[in-house]
Regions:
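Carbohydrate-associated surface elements
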Residues: 48, 186, 204-205
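Conserved donor-binding/catalytic core segment of Leloir-type glycosyltransferases
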Residues: 218-236, 242-245, 255
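Nucleotide-sugar donor phosphate/pyrophosphate-binding loop at the beta->alpha transition
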Residues: 95, 136-139, 150-172, 208, ...
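A charged, aromatic-enriched C-terminal amphipathic alpha-helix characteristic of glycosyltransferases
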Residues: 350-353, 366-397
């Protein structure tokens, strides 16, 4: 096995990266911070920045197609094209295919590496990573950040014949990966039950030294301040929060911070019900902590009618646990288990009346808003990104060592493997189009 002080080179393929503000960006900029200290040189292949414009986003930092950027962590960023086609599912898929094709071309021309990591759920990008790894003769690490394709089935993104085709395509790549990484134990267990080998869990987390512990909220506040900060999409069932706030009335104020496809509909619902809801744009860094500071209870929410969410933990969970605020947990499965194990918050069902009953209880007894204090210690022990990055580094080194124990293949053999993989990926893509 390579000693820790030996520099190794990692190639990361992702659909979103800095200066965007997105789940893969937050995860990987946090991991890369420590990986570089662990002796890794990291190259990133990603589309021109276009989504979730973070605080560093501008015409220079977003990058240009086929150009190379030097990231602020010391990584090299290789940009591939992204076309502004539109926001519907067809256009999104088209852009994924374009980005995936560009990732193959760029990925094979990034110099020498020791391993390829792809962070999913983009199906086309999974195929790209397999092709790049085969061409360069490198081990492939597939990171499944969501319970996918289960989540796609729950959201009706795949139907009919396309369902089995997409499942087969994902399993094809997973079964040929040298290592599969999940962010929850539940989904890792699901993959093992399907026969996927070499599955490990490296959960999401936070950097504790950048996450303050806030003083308790005041006891004499006139109304309950409830905050949801995050994506406003179909997955979160945020309309239930508005309906619950309508039942509570003037004793509380609900604040939404962020953006997403459902935000216009949520605004309309709040107006129709006459609810005191404050809608704010996305906020970053210190502004987020100030928003937490003015809140009494922070909401973590996932809809309860998608089975895949039993194996899903919203990435904000760890930050909310560490910050020192009461948690309204509208979650089940593994996310609920984390809150229970950490000893923080109240878990309620995804029903307006249940949520309203909880909030009325908090209004009546503000002493319940005082966190137990065990959440931050739990995060320090289980979800500190510097520790998770060390775990990831060791797994990558073991995977590289195992891959190198096999006799290297000639370039001709590698090209033949790429050809076979490309044919399989192309067949799956055609099958998906015919089934759609």
């Amino acid at each position: 096995m390579q000693p820790p002080d030996t520099e190794l080179r990692l190639l990361l393929l992702t659909s979103s990266y800095w200066p965007e503000h997105s789940p893969p960006q937050r995860r990987w900029t946090s991991l890369i911070t420590t990986l570089c200290d662990q002796g890794w040189a990291v190259s990133v292949v990603a589309p021109v920045a276009h989504y979730g414009q973070g605080p560093d986003y501008n015409s220079d930092t977003k990058g240009h197609a086929w150009r190379v950027q030097h990231g602020f962590l010391g990584e090299r960023i290789y940009r591939v094209p992204h076309l502004l086609l539109g926001d519907n599912r067809i256009f999104k898929l088209a852009n994924q295919v374009i980005g995936a094709a560009g990732s193959v071309l760029r990925g094979v021309a990034t110099g020498r590496q020791d391993a390829v990591v792809v962070t999913a759920p983009s199906l086309p990008l999974l195929g790209s990573a397999l092709l790049v790894a085969r061409f360069k003769g490198l081990p492939l690490v597939v990171e499944m950040r969501d319970a996918w394709p289960n989540l796609a089935e729950d959201a009706s993104l795949v139907r009919g014949g396309s369902k089995s085709v997409i499942n087969s395509a994902v399993e094809y790549v997973q079964n040929r990966a040298d290592l599969v990484v999940t962010v929850t134990e539940g989904f890792a267990r699901t993959l093992r039950e399907r026969g996927v080998a070499n599955v490990v869990t490296v959960r999401n987390g936070i950097l504790m030294d950048r996450t303050p512990h806030l003083a308790a909220p005041p006891f004499d506040r006139e109304r309950l301040e409830v905050l949801y900060l995050g994506n406003h999409g179909e997955s979160q069932a945020l309309d239930v929060l508005i309906r619950a706030a309508a039942l509570v009335g003037e004793d509380m104020r609900l604040t939404f911070v962020g953006h997403g496809s459902q935000k216009p509909a949520l605004r309309r619902l709040a107006m129709e019900l006459g609810v005191n809801v404050r809608f704010l744009p996305p906020e970053y860094r210190e502004a987020v902590f100030e928003r937490y500071r003015e809140a009494d209870s922070l909401v973590i929410s996932l809809r309860d009618d998608w089975k895949s969410f039993e194996d899903t933990i919203p990435s904000k969970t760890y930050e909310v646990l560490a910050i020192g605020r009461h948690i309204t947990g509208i979650v089940r499965g593994e996310a609920a288990n984390v809150l229970t194990e950490a000893g923080e918050g109240d878990i309620v069902g995804c029903k307006p009346q249940e949520i309203a009953d909880l909030w009325r209880g908090l209004v009546a007894d503000r002493g319940r808003l005082q966190p137990a204090g065990s959440g931050r210690a739990w995060v320090q022990h289980n979800a500190e990104y510097s520790d998770l990055a060390c775990q990831y580094s060791e797994l990558l080194r073991e995977t590289i060592h195992e891959h190198r124990t096999h006799p290297p293949q000639s370039l001709g053999r590698r090209i033949a493997r790429v050809g076979r993989a490309a044919v399989k990926v192309a067949r799956n893509a055609r099958s998906v189009r015919r089934s759609a």
